[in-house]
């Protein structure tokens, strides 16, 4: 078990926020993660369309807050699009996924990300375009996730707790997969 997890579980971990996102976690004790309940091919209007899908599903489930997709394009890495939080990332039921951003991008997570915004179990692959360290997969990205016919893109899997959660395979852009959504 990771040392920070033990401290957090014992209620002994104080949250100091002096990193690059200083102030962004003020008043926030955790950031929620879910997987979409719908599947779509690689053409969902780039990162903006993916973010809109996450926001829509969060709103439909009455989740407060801003949600964005865990999705990188070659020109827009997730590490530059999402809040790099110093608080834990959890599923919508409270299950711990990672202690903080650095833990999220260290190659393993504590539990599979397999619950949708309504806490229903969902399985399968997930469009990510993102390597385990939060940087983009540089070989192809379905033309910035705006094409369902050209190329391939990186996907993860909801069944994994190792690096495969975000970097598992490179299916054709016509494949219908889910997205991960993370509270900002």
Regions found by a protein language model. Give the residues of each.
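Secreted/extracellular ectodomain signature
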Residues: 16-184
